[in-house]
Regions:
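Conserved alpha-helical scaffold segments that buttress catalytic/binding sites
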Residues: 2-163
Length: 163
């Protein structure tokens, strides 16, 4: 795997810390990368910022559901290469594949601009049939953006081709 850390464990009392990816209901993976963004940067900061806010989370949902029995494992961040998007995409796909291998866990990725969608979906699709539900102000269906096929502007197009 290409992870920067050994992980962060459970999320401040929300859920129960799983011992391994195979024990987890939910796997959390940070992707601190915004090298595919064409405009304002900042998605690379999302994993750390989201984790810093988990202290505000409660173990009961707004509907009253008890979430404390959900087994969560935060496995850390993908080790990204700020100046080499293709190397980063390989690391994302390899990390996602490795942590999902042999599990029924749900992967939740945090951070990254839209360009990280393609390598995540490639890894998830190895498990079987995969679908995508896309919410965005625009469809991100460009074939290329400034000559790059894996930009934020082509994420949904690559997802359609992958799934």
């Amino acid at each position: 795997m290409f992870l920067k850390s050994e992980g962060y464990g459970a999320w401040n009392g929300v859920g129960t810390k799983a011992n391994s990816p195979g024990d987890a209901d939910v796997l959390i993976l940070g992707i601190p990368f915004d090298g595919g963004a064409g405009g304002q940067r900042g998605a690379a900061f999302a994993p750390g910022r989201v984790r810093s806010m988990t202290g505000r989370l409660k173990s009961t949902s707004r509907r009253g559901d008890d979430l404390s029995s959900i087994r969560i494992l935060d496995i850390g961040d993908v080790d990204v290469s700020t100046f080499d998007a293709m190397k980063t995409f390989d690391a994302i796909e390899c990390s996602c594949s490795a942590v999902l291998d042999g599990t029924d866990s749900t992967l939740v990725s945090i951070g990254g601009d839209h360009s990280v969608t393609h390598p995540i979906l490639k890894a998830v699709a190895k498990r079987g049939r995969t679908g995508v539900i896309w919410f965005d102000a625009h469809p991100d269906l460009l074939d290329t953006y400034h000559g790059f096929s894996f930009s934020h502007g082509s994420a949904l197009r690559r997802a359609i081709e992958t799934t």
